[in-house]
Amino acid sequence: MKLNMGKRELELDGKYLGRLREANDLMGNPEALRARMQEDGYLLIRRLHDPEKVKAVRRVLIDNLAANGQIDCSHPLDEAWIAPGARGAFMGGAKAVTHSPEFLDVVEAPELMQFFSDFLGGPSLTYNYKWLRAVGAGDFTGAHYDVVYMGRGTRNLYTVWTPLGDVPFNKGPLAILEGSQHFERVKATYGQMDVDRDHVTGWFSNDPLELIEQYGGRWLT
């Protein structure tokens, strides 16, 4: 299977693109989860969220996008067809949708907060600011570290990528560059940036193969 990533076409399970390793078998064992995080730099956990809560916030998001002309309403609304010419939307910060009860029921769910309290070994907190994006067909988010967007107050943080619905390969799932948590030179330079303070976009590269050729690893999805 070939998948598009930016302007590149990559073969799944090939030289440049593999699959993320699941961590569900480690649930309930914080020590093992911490060791896996240290090893892989991520934790892929399926079914952590209540599916009904995810469906509820998806409906709120689709209604919001439709009201702003981002959805093709000639198709069933729950299928969320992108309107011709629509390029997606960023709805972070003070946008009402990121403070709706349905959205907060997912991203601040008791089960999620408890997971991090167990993982961190103490009470966990979350930012009031949330980063919510809808990315248009054929677009992608360039390679980046999340910390350049959200690490100004503290770097002792973890981010949670939460798809609001099923995301098969053809609908743009997350991709992580294998081993990138150990790219010390990148962490000491680009990783010290702050997008607001330094007035930069936050992307390190929009070419997925450039990073592999320079630093090694492969993309995992």
PLM features: residue spans?
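A structural signal for well-ordered alpha-helical scaffolds and beta->alpha junctions
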Residues: P30, A109-M113, L157, V167, ...
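Residues that flank catalytic or metal-binding motifs in active/ligand-binding sites
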Residues: H99, Y127-N128, N156, V160, ...
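Conserved hydrophobic/aromatic beta-strand scaffold that supports enzyme active sites
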Residues: Y42-L44, T159-P163, G217-W219
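Non-heme Fe(II)-dependent double-stranded beta-helix
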Residues: K2-D40, R46-A143, Y149-R152
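Short loop segments at secondary-structure junctions
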Residues: R47-H49, L164-P168, G179-Q181
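Double-stranded beta-helix
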Residues: N170-T221
